[in-house]
Amino acid sequence: MADLIEIKRGESRFHTKIDWLDSWHSFSFGPHYDPANLGFGLLLVNNDDIIRAGSGFGTHAHSDMEIVTWVLDGELEHRDSLGTIGIIKPGDAQRMSAGTGVQHSEINPSSTTDLHLLQMWVLPDTKGIAPSYEQLSISESLASNELIPVASGQGHLGAVAIHQREAVLWVSRLSAHGSVTVPSAPFTHVFVARGSVHLSSEDKKTEYVLAAGDAAQLTNSNTSRLTASAEGAEVLVWEMGIK
């Protein structure tokens, strides 16, 4: 199945909870630091955030990072120093390349509904590029019960482009008992956003059950499959090469 596989349970993640934010961090982030958990492959941040209605992150700065946001519920209002204003909804792929430096805010514009999103940071393959922003809707493709490219450094059609040739983010919304093949790669990060899945080797001799919030980190992975439970599932898979 893989030379190495490590299962990370959702409850083991770092946790930040304040009046307007409930955030779970897969890797070291902010005040949460573990030198043994600084990321996986090229993925440095995998934050699972619930932002209360009318709240959010005020203007703050980033540089030399590829930032991908995936909304699960609600809407996100993005504003940045490039003059971009975007509303990101479920089914939208959004990428901000921080490059030489950019400031932005991320707000839940609703007065009644909480916002649930995943934000992921990936190292760029080139530092000092011009900052940029891209947003695309891929909702129709997600109905196919397949892995759909959401953010890609390899020119996948329909995906936002990231400045990292060794990384592709795939998303699948699986119906009950739906199944997809996990890409083989030096580093593969599987995160379950909703529902639950079985991660199994091709011969089905090895199997793990992953619930919402759980992740699997596969190193030098061989062929494996994700199969949704009866409730279905939404999974995000980072396929990554060598740094």
Task: Name the predicted role of every residue range.
Residues 1-243:
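Jelly-roll (double-stranded beta-helix
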